[in-house]
Amino acid sequence: MGAMAKPDCIITCDSKNLTIKTESTLKTTQFSGTLGEKFEENTADGRRTQTVCNFTDGALVQHQEWDGKESTITRKLKDGKLVVERVMNHVACTRIYEKAQ
């Protein structure tokens, strides 16, 4: 069911303050932090992670650590679409968002 949800992803950044909000019919999550500084994030699946976000090579890179594990989420614009790649333990998945009209 969750894989079929078509969420909206709203990213705002003013100076160094970043907010990412993901809204779907199933759930809405949001986190905020300062670029380059670690902060605690409560993820949609209930994990409490230590997260740091930075802009690297034109992409927004979000690195999460929890319970001895880590994952990286990279968001970049490509051909007018938001491409989100998630990597954990050398396994990657990609989700593509189209801009709302």
Swiss-Prot record:
Listed InterPro entries: Calycin, Fatty_acid-bd, ILBP, Lipocln_cytosolic_FA-bd_dom
GO cellular component term of the entry, any: cytosol
Keyword Transport: yes
KW Chloroplast (keyword) present: no
Molecular function via GO: fatty acid binding
GO biological process: fatty acid transport
Keywords: Lipid-binding, Transport
Entry-linked Gene3D superfamilies: 2.40.128.20
Domain notes: Forms a beta-barrel structure that accommodates the hydrophobic ligand in its interior.
PANTHER family per the UniProt record, alphabetical: FATTY ACID BINDING PROTEIN
Similarity section: Belongs to the calycin superfamily. Fatty-acid binding protein (FABP) family.
Its job: High specificity for fatty acids.
Protein's UniProt name: Putative fatty acid-binding protein 5-like protein 3
Annotated organism of origin: Homo sapiens (Human)
